[in-house]
Amino acid sequence: MHRPKGIDAAIEALGFVEYQDKSEKRFNHYTLDRPAAGSGTSDFRNRYYNTPAQTISYYGQVNFWYWLGRSGFSLMPSYKYRGAHVEKDNDIYRLEQLAGWGSDADFGALPSEREYLERTYDAGNSFNRDQKTYEHTFDFCIRYNHEVGKGNLGAYLGMPVRLTKRTLDYKRAMIDTLFSKSNTDFSPKANIRYNWHNWSRSVELSYNMSTKLYDLVQTLDVRSDDNPLNVTLGNGALKNAVTHKASLSYTNNSSRKQRFFSAGVDYSAVRNQIGYSSEYNRATGVYTYRPVNVNGNYTIAGNVNYSMALDKKRRWNLSTATTAQLYNNVDIITVTGADENPRSKVKTFFLGETVKVDYRLGRQKIGAKLGCNWRNATSAREDFATVNAANFNYGLTGQFELPCGFQLFTDLTMYSRRGYEAHEMNTDELVWNARLSKQVWKKRLTLALEGFDILHNLSAVTHTLNGQGRTETYRNVIPSYGMLHVIYRLNVQPKKK
């Protein structure tokens, strides 16, 4: 908050209350075949999910400012209160347990309510969760803002202390438990910034620490096997995760010369990061997951950005962005019956570069772009295959003012990937997107027709590498689409007295 002229102290209060009532009903046909196990091993499930949920949240905050004369120092004590009450049911019904409701049953159909409520309830995976959260945060901040030399020095130190109490009432199969957990955490924040040369140049250093609380349900002795190939367990020994982040940045901008430069370095490390250990059973093909705390995860990243006008009339413009990142990812991976070290550490180095050139003539604009990034992932694991892969893209963009007030935005880009061990990840996809729009009715109403992946080259299946160097597959039901937008702009001016 900027200091109002002639004011030495100020107070501010705010708050809100929010209520949500949601209900979701889902149907699922699931078939698991095990050909290696012989005949009669097919597992078919006709499932119906009913998941109503109610949430009420409330928040209040009081801030107080006090400026210490002309010293440049100001004090800001504050208090925040946040509360929430969440009640959720997850009712699962195995309809195939009724005669005539197997694989031949109509998808999305339900038998009589009495039949499926009494005879098909999946008590082992259904649950009722009622959780209340009370959170108090006391913060004391010191700020400094003053002219120093030929520039301006700003500094900030925040010392928030958070007191949290959570109460969970949980019912599931043989479990009916009510318990509470209290937590106190300290999350300091600090920032120092110096601006000079009429605020066009600056250097900034910041640090903050934050605590993430584990989910209370994760600590329960619960087995979830709704997906028979992915079983989830609980862990009563979980600890809260603590993240440390630090950053250093420098900027040098010249509006007169149309040159902009920035560079930065970021570091983050997590202690007791909450992840899931995985154990694979080769005989059954089942993965068993369990929440655990892991240490050793950190990220170091750097970036350099530069843009400039290439000619005196500033019609040609060039921009570049360079990024470099080092990830150290630690996870717990085991195989049933194996003697290998379950701790899996993967180091990934990422280097990326993006270059764009634009030409503008009046209200018309065309551009060319080129992007490339290289990824190298290594691990001491015996079963790990080193990753040396590159993603690159190149294309053209355009923004045109057409007759009759129409505007056209278009983008034609080739996306390519090379060097992946999984051949399905080495792809070339030419993607064309366009948007045609027009403003009418004194520019209050905008009509726009948008087309995404007009050439239908994008695959509905996306393959990515996670932090452990493993391939993850995602499916998009609608990779290509067309959409009509109708946007009305409403401006209500206050009446003059």
Give residue spans per PLM region:
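Primarily recognizes Gram-negative and organellar outer-membrane beta-barrels
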Residues: M1-K497
